[in-house]
Amino acid sequence: MNPEYDYLFKLLLIGDSGVGKSCLLLRFADDTYTESYISTIGVDFKIRTIELDGKTIKLQIWDTAGQERFRTITSSYYRGAHGIIVVYDVTDQESYANVKQWLQEIDRYASENVNKLLVGNKSDLTTKKVVDNTTAKEFADSLGVPFLETSAKNATNVEQAFMTMAAEIKKRMGPGAASGGERPNLKIDSTPVKPASGGCC
């Protein structure tokens, strides 16, 4: 058994461009925040190790580009994911409306029993908020998916979002899945990244 961790979970952040996926990842992995917006090109990832119920869990969190032109690259990353976090911007009605489309992408590309979490980001922008918490919560409940509102800027619920996801995956896997059980499926495909070098600047 690898002494460094008991579990390795691969998580995926998806959602429209500009909803704050990269900011959530930066806040959780590095506890930093930046106001400057640089759109993710293709796929990026960070790793953070957490403790949960006395177990060490290594989270490999993949941040995907929201733009349509990267969809063929990012879709290949759904396959090995244990958990997928769908992010929308509480100040952007369109990003919330598109959640259904993102959920369809999960159904199309991810494994059948993948864990899902719905996150409404930018909750600090209270005066600009257009997506009601109750509406989103009812929608998430109808799907049986956990829901949280977060703010990467002031760190509200960011830790909780990733910890919730890790706990849900661990619960689904059960005690017998530690270490060896899931790891063979976690070989990361390097091939899908190659199209990114094909001139989409």
From Swiss-Prot:
The activity regulation comment is: Regulated by guanine nucleotide exchange factors (GEFs) which promote the exchange of bound GDP for free GTP. Regulated by GTPase activating proteins (GAPs) including TBC1D20 which increases the GTP hydrolysis activity. Inhibited by GDP dissociation inhibitors (GDIs).
Q: Which CDD domains match?
A: Rab1_Ypt1 (cd01869)
Question: Which portions of the sequence form the region Disordered?
Answer: 174-201
Matching PROSITE patterns, A to Z?
RAB (PS51419)
Q: Which reaction does it catalyse?
A: GTP + H2O = GDP + phosphate + H(+)
Write down which residues bear the modification named Cysteine methyl ester. Answer: 201
Q: List residues modified as N-acetylmethionine.
A: 1
Membrane topology reported for the UniProt record: Lipid-anchor
UniProt binding sites for Mg(2+): 22, 40, 63
Subcellular location field:
Cytoplasm; Membrane; Preautophagosomal structure membrane; Cytoplasm, Perinuclear region
Q: Where is this motif: Switch 1?
A: 30-45
> Signal peptide span per the entry?
none
Report the function annotation for this chain. The small GTPases Rab are key regulators of intracellular membrane trafficking, from the formation of transport vesicles to their fusion with membranes. Rabs cycle between an inactive GDP-bound form and an active GTP-bound form that is able to recruit to membranes different set of downstream effectors directly responsible for vesicle formation, movement, tethering and fusion. Plays a role in the initial events of the autophagic vacuole development which take place at specialized regions of the endoplasmic reticulum.
Q: Which family does it belong to?
A: Belongs to the small GTPase superfamily. Rab family.
Instruction: Fill in the domain comment.
Output: Switch 1, switch 2 and the interswitch regions are characteristic of Rab GTPases and mediate the interactions with Rab downstream effectors. The switch regions undergo conformational changes upon nucleotide binding which drives interaction with specific sets of effector proteins, with most effectors only binding to GTP-bound Rab.
The family database entries (PANTHER family) matched by this protein are listed as: RAS-RELATED PROTEIN RAB
Name of the protein described by the UniProt record: Ras-related protein Rab-1B
